[in-house]
């Protein structure tokens, strides 16, 4: 998207993938020779490499990106002895199948799912030993949409602007993971320390989100904000890492003119011409031309909400 242009195209789009045949692997740091890899036997519809993102570049048009639930990825990394900022995999809905070429410790967090190392069952939220050559299978998410996988040593693809995260909107970072990829692994970090945690589960009922009105609430009719805070919305099946679309009572505008393109932040609730709110997630654009009626404090739970989930907004607690 060109700098200074209003973001009026559909903000929810497919991740960019390079043309041509399946690529044999991702380059390791500094293009060095990679010996230990994680082989991808089945990638699923959207599996990406993610860490905690690349903050500090919004003024250059680069969003933070990174894991949609940073706490879930950080927990997975702690469970295997990695730094919390190490890169892992974000797996969407249908699971994946992987095979390491060296013995590793792995941890899966996020949605509840079947996890197996060969024939041996494992658990979400606990470290698992995977011998060299064994197959790790992560089944479909039973609640929520996504899982995060940490592997001892981390996924050591080449960083871009200090991060290994895939940005599906701009194409920065490694491409989305595909069948047959060989993902380089970093050095073994040593045995994982004991971690005493309670693993949270994605919300399965009505989702309540705190909304801070503005900066363009005055572009809407007086009852639009009351409608947003007083009526339920439903998560649409049209959504991805860029944004979560909601359907419900349309939010009518009081100002019909064009809004000059301005900055967009994580959690911004933009209202396109159809009046249906769109909540921007990690791969959001940094500028937009539709008015933003408010900003959601924490989008991690929304990123796990399945289509059909009921969402209610409420104002900040005083």
Language-model segments: residues:
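Conserved "landmark" site that anchors the functional core of diverse proteins
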Residues: 1-318
């Amino acid at each position: 998207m060109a700098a200074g242009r209003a973001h009026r195209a559909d903000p929810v789009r497919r991740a960019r993938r390079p043309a041509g045949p399946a690529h044999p692997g991702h380059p390791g740091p500094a293009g060095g020779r990679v010996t230990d890899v994680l082989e991808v036997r089945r990638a699923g519809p959207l599996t990406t490499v993610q860490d905690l993102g690349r903050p500090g570049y919004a003024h250059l048009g680069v969003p933070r990106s990174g894991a949609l639930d940073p706490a879930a990825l950080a927990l997975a990394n702690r469970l295997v002895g990695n730094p919390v900022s190490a890169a892992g995999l974000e797996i969407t809905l249908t699971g994946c199948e992987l095979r390491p070429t060296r013995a590793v410790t792995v941890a899966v967090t996020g949605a509840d799912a079947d996890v197996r190392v060969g024939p041996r069952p494992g658990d979400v939220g606990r470290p698992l030993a995977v011998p060299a050559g064994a197959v790790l299978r992560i089944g479909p998410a039973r609640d929520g949409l996504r899982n995060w996988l940490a592997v001892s040593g981390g996924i050591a693809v080449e960083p871009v602007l200090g991060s290994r995260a895939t940005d599906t909107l701009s194409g920065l970072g490694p491409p989305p993971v595909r069948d047959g990829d060989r993902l380089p692994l970093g050095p073994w970090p040593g045995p994982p320390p004991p971690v005493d945690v309670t693993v949270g589960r994605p919300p399965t009922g009505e989702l309540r989100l705190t909304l801070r009105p503005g900066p363009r609430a005055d572009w809407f009719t007086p009852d639009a904000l009351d409608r947003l805070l007083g009526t339920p919305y439903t998560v649409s099946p049209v959504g991805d890492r860029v944004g979560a679309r909601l359907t419900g009572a349309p939010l009518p505008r009081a100002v019909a003119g064009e809004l000059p393109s301005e900055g967009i932040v994580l959690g911004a609730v933009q209202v396109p011409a159809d009046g249906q709110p769109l909540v921007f997630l990690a791969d959001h654009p940094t500028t937009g031309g539709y008015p933003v009626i408010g900003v959601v404090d924490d989008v991690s739970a929304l990123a796990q909400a399945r289509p059909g989930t009921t969402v209610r907004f409420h104002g900040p607690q005083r």
